[in-house]
């Protein structure tokens, strides 16, 4: 997530019942966990509205328990928030994105939205995966190519030109950068 104000990201597992799951356990489908991204951001530079814009636009939230060719509950679309005050803006963004999707005949958003129970850091080899050599061929998050416009209580802080670094017309990863 090469967005101004994003301090760090890490991938992990959340939403399930198993304590400290391994990747293989999560892939079994028996843990109940989803593969997730933890985002730490500077609220003075970037708003949760901007992060929600990125979230909705960079994958297909209408797919249930899958992203692209990756199938299973561990690949479900989910937002786990850790501050109850964030719930309203998340729901507002979901409603606005659903309306935008309906205009292009997409189905219902399947994204799970709930308070974060526990986050488990994934194995080191999963961290910053998209920055690793050759990862782009496999990346299967397929964007809908539908953009999230303003929505109730949104407070976008990033300028429009920031979003020019993303190509919403590609079928897989949308970040424009060198990664052979």
Locate each region found by the language model.
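Flexible coil/turn and secondary-structure edge motifs
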Residues: 1-180
């Amino acid at each position: 997530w090469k967005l101004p104000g994003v301090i760090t990201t890490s991938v992990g597992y959340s939403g399930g019942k198993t304590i400290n799951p391994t990747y293989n356990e999560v892939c079994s489908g028996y843990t109940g966990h989803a593969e997730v991204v933890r985002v730490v951001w500077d609220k003075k530079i970037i708003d949760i509205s901007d992060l929600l814009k990125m979230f909705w636009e960079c994958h297909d939230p209408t797919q249930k328990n899958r992203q692209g060719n990756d199938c299973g509950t561990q690949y479900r679309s989910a937002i786990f928030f850790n501050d109850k005050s964030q719930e309203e803006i998340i729901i507002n963004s979901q409603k606005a994105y659903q309306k935008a999707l309906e205009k292009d005949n997409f189905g219902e958003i399947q994204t799970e939205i709930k308070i974060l129970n526990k986050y488990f850091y994934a194995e080191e080899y999963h961290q910053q995966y998209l920055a690793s050599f050759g990862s782009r061929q496999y990346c299967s998050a397929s964007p809908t190519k539908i953009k999230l416009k303003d929505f109730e209580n949104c407070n976008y802080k990033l300028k429009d030109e920031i979003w020019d670094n993303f190509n919403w017309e590609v079928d897989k990863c949308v970040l424009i950068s060198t990664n052979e």
